[in-house]
Amino acid sequence: MARQFSLEKTRNIGIIAHIDAGKTTTTERILFHTGKIHKIGETHDGASQMDWMEQEQERGITITSAATTAFWKNHRINIIDTPGHVDFTVEVSRSLRVLDGAVTVIDAQAGVEPQTETVWRQASEYKVPRVIFVNKMDKVGADFAYAIETLKQRLGVHASAIQWPIGSENDFNGIIDLVEMNAFEYDNTSQETGKVVSIPSDLESITQTKRKELIETLSTLDEELMIYYLEEKPISSEMLKNSIRKATLQASFFPVLCGSSFKNKGVVKMLDAVVDYLPAPCDVAAIVGFDSDNQEIVRTGLDEEPFTALAFKVMTDPYVGKLTFFRIYSGSVKAGSYVTNTTKGTKERFGRLLQMHANSREEVKEAYTGDILAVVGLKATTTGDTLASEGQTIILESMNFPEPVIEIAVEPKTKADQDKMGIALAKLAEEDPTFKVFSNHETGQTIIAGMGELHLDIIIERLKREFKVQANVTEPQVAYRETITQETETEGKFIRQSGGRGQYGHVWMRFEPNPGKGFEFVNKIVGGVVPREYVPAVQKGIQEALAGGILAGYQIIDVKATLFDGSYHDVDSSEIAFKIAASMALKETKTKGNPVILEPIMDVEVVTPNDYVGNVIGDLTSRRGRLENQESRTNAVAIRAFVPLSEMFGYATVLRSNTQGRATFIMQFAKYEKAPKSITEEIIKKRA
């Protein structure tokens, strides 16, 4: 099957935003206006096409990223709708890794919110060009100018309006195009019909001002435009459009549009902006990978190059089994062909190739550069793995995911549940890199860990609904961590000789704090005092010992371990002996490395009416919260603080009580910090 759309006519975009900004509603309107669906489903009715999971429909939120494809003005647009809730940021992160552009949706009344900042930061890490859609212009308190100001103040970006609203709240009924210098008035039908009209006379002055501001902002980024502007030459709409596209592709400028997805106003104009300003796969930089010798390999994104793709998501489909979602960066692949998983060094066979629409699917025979599809039949591939044509060794940069911060113990209710639970949890962990399953060695309990209470609630619900596993759960526990704060050198020596062949392993290790960089192992052995074949065993021994902790049994993080000396025995040395010796060396850091317990700190934002500001601040302070700032919003105050997770259990109920149910809050993991001495002593005592 030949390619249907050229690379230039392809767009891979994501819809990203804070929860309740209207992402899924916006995606539904895109699908409706592009003819992908013929009846609009509403999120609040549980009828959204993209929110296909039962839990999504019941809760009215997006939990998993859903992929679909739409067509607009002879362009193919692959769309991924992502969650806005902080517990599911992994879905945003892995989607952005494979997308070329994004539409950031913000609420016209609230402006930039905490999760907007998080998804914006994630998109910036991957250098994803974005257009910004200020949604809910029909909402009480909607303020387009305020929303743009929050973009500049809170995100610190070059963002300018390329549209201006005609009216707001109930009177929002049109959009002025600052590029074409015309206006579009809507009638109130679901078709987003309307007509091009001249700019209303009472808005002519502000239109000229805002167009001038747009040109001034762009001229600082575009030398040709600056010359025209300084010489007061007329700037055509075509020239302005080209300048916007160029700056947007460089992610140095972000055009701002407005509308109301729910009322079908502005979505078609936003689709035009996706085609006009967001990149095609051939507009983005060449993809760089490395071979097994760490030599750089470049793929420029052509169908003629060898097949190279990245697996970014794994999920279990009740009808076809394991589905692996992947993005093709070069070359093409046919259903039934064999490829290499270069990350794991294994051979995989591509079964059926599927073009997804939420949870429905359409089979295709061949896929090309720039395509985002799902494949059936991959056995060993997991999120972040590189797939390449046979004989290729390229490995693309993988993805990093945050560590879980909250844990609960799960116990199967019956023997039948016990048999099914292990398989079910393994499948769920394979799908979600921020969900972890492990056993408590002391109690024998199965522990599941995730990014928040909602995250784990959804996991338990999926166990029941999808896998028919009934389980009892304990109260949530904080996922504390341990680390060392002082560099130290320790010796680990393991000798067992009781007749016959013995065991001999001997290492000298240097352990150093490694803040924010995780575990790092360095081999500094010279002269073969520890033979090369035993070095991996030393590393493995340390990694296994890190998982068990040295103070209270919590995982040790952010440590650099250097093997610099040791000895061996020609006959008695073995891998197991060196593993044990390495773990003994790590345990010595309990007395020499000044170990501490780390607790997860949450970034909390509470939005409350003015009357309750004192109550909210007093309560946050009593929870060991550190106030960062407070900011006036429309008829409310936003209070931001860093608070230990251990102090936030049950906070929703207390906040409701303190504010008569009129305040809202959101929290997300910020960092790990050293726990106070009293908390540390209490934790160690409990774990003793």
Curated annotation (Swiss-Prot):
Residues annotated to bind GTP: 17-24, 81-85, 135-138
Residue stretches in coiled coil: none
Keywords of the record: Cytoplasm, Elongation factor, GTP-binding, Nucleotide-binding, Protein biosynthesis
Gene3D superfamilies per record: 3.30.230.10, 3.30.70.240, Elongation Factor G (Translational Gtpase), domain 3 (3.30.70.870), P-loop containing nucleotide triphosphate hydrolases (3.40.50.300), Translation factors (2.40.30.10)
GO BP terms: ribosome disassembly
First-listed, main subcellular location of the protein, grouped into a coarse class: cytoplasm
tr-type G domain residues: 8-282
GO CC annotations on file: cytoplasm
GO molecular function term, any single one: GTPase activity
InterPro entries listed in its UniProt record: EF-G-like_DII (IPR053905), EFG_II (IPR041095), EFG_III (IPR009022), EFG_III/V (IPR035647), EFG_IV (IPR047872), EFG_V (IPR035649), EFG_V-like (IPR000640), G_TR_CS (IPR031157)
Source organism superkingdom: Bacteria
SMART domains: EFG_C, EFG_IV
Protein location: Cytoplasm
Alphabetized PANTHER family for the sequence: RIBOSOME-RELEASING FACTOR 2, MITOCHONDRIAL (PTHR43261:SF1), TRANSLATION ELONGATION FACTOR G-RELATED (PTHR43261)
Family: Belongs to the TRAFAC class translation factor GTPase superfamily. Classic translation factor GTPase family. EF-G/EF-2 subfamily.
NCBIfam families for this protein: EF-G, PRK12740.1-3, PRK12740.1-5, small_GTP
Entry function: Catalyzes the GTP-dependent ribosomal translocation step during translation elongation. During this step, the ribosome changes from the pre-translocational (PRE) to the post-translocational (POST) state as the newly formed A-site-bound peptidyl-tRNA and P-site-bound deacylated tRNA move to the P and E sites, respectively. Catalyzes the coordinated movement of the two tRNA molecules, the mRNA and conformational changes in the ribosome.
UniProt name for this protein: Elongation factor G
Species classification: Bacteria, Bacillati, Mycoplasmatota, Mollicutes, Acholeplasmatales
Gene: fusA
